[in-house]
Design a protein with these regions (language model features):
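Catalytic core of Fe(II)/2-oxoglutarate
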Residues: 111, 118-129, 139-212
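Generic structural "secondary-structure junction" signal
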Residues: 27, 60, 76, 106-109, ...
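A structural signal for well-ordered alpha-helical scaffolds and beta->alpha junctions
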Residues: 26, 30, 68, 77-81, ...
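Short, well-ordered beta-to-alpha junction loops that form the rim of enzyme active sites
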Residues: 23-24, 100, 117, 181
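Non-heme Fe(II)/2-oxoglutarate
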Residues: 1-88
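Non-heme Fe(II) oxygenase catalytic core, chiefly the N-lobe of the double-stranded beta-helix
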Residues: 38, 74-128, 140, 144
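A structural signal for short, well-ordered beta-strand segments and their strand-loop junctions
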Residues: 20-21, 46-47, 94-99, 103, ...
Length: 212
């Protein structure tokens, strides 16, 4: 990921540090994540709702072999944390072994996430959330199906002058990572409008923390 440092630094200078990495995992592993996600027993899912938004979440990955391996052997590994630190310049990054708010997520057809900013304090870890990573895993996703991750320079629901900084399509095996700041970045997800036979916009999320 060190080759993404220039992109990260450029976006940071503009006030919105983030990068997009395509073909992040090998195709087979990413497909296994998708199959595991859509076949996970319904009883373990929670539903997040707010102001017309709706997202399904599943973070008990201990019984899911592919997600467990990818999370703890790759995304939480010392090697990956070292790469993140080199790319972002943020030292002392720590993963969350409890996956508070992380893990699988699904946005089904017709759903959105309205503009908001994420929590940046993990009360269980007593740490500040610094980075958010999202890996999109629905195969053959098309840009016109929506579900884009939209970054704003303000909250359009509170500020009529707020504008879109970037809109990123949730293409299969695309990984995006962005820096969390106090009350930011404001982001949303555009309406998911996939065909009826597509399960939805599926992803797996990873959060990273610092002590100060």
């Amino acid at each position: 990921m060190i080759n993404k440092k220039v992109e990260w630094d450029r976006n940071k200078e503009e006030g919105f540090p983030r990068v997009t990495i395509d073909n992040f995992l090998d195709q087979e592993t990413c497909m296994k994540l998708y199959e595991e996600c859509v076949n996970t027993p319904k009883g373990g899912w929670t539903v997040f709702t707010r102001a017309g938004s709706r997202m399904e979440e599943f973070n008990d990955l201990i019984s899911l072999p592919t997600a467990h391996r990818v999370t703890y052997d790759i995304m939480h590994s010392g090697e990956f944390l070292y790469q993140l630190e080199n790319m972002t310049g943020i030292v002392g990054l720590l993963p969350d072994p409890h996956l508070v708010g992380a893990g699988y997520s699904i946005l089904r057809k017709g759903t959105i996430l309205s503009p908001h900013y994420d929590f940046n304090w993990n009360d269980r870890l007593r740490l500040h959330r610094k980075l958010t990573g999202i890996l999109y895993i629905t195969p053959d996703w098309k840009s016109e199906w929506g579900g884009h991750n939209v970054t704003w320079n303000g909250n359009p629901e509170l500020d009529s002058t707020a504008q879109i900084v970037e809109s990123t399509a949730p293409l299969f095996n695309r990984f995006i990572i962005s820096e969390n700041v106090l009350k930011g970045p404001v982001h949303s997800v555009s309406k998911v409008d996939c065909p009826d036979d597509v399960y939805g916009r599926c992803a797996i999320r990873f959060f990273y923390y610092v002590s100060t």
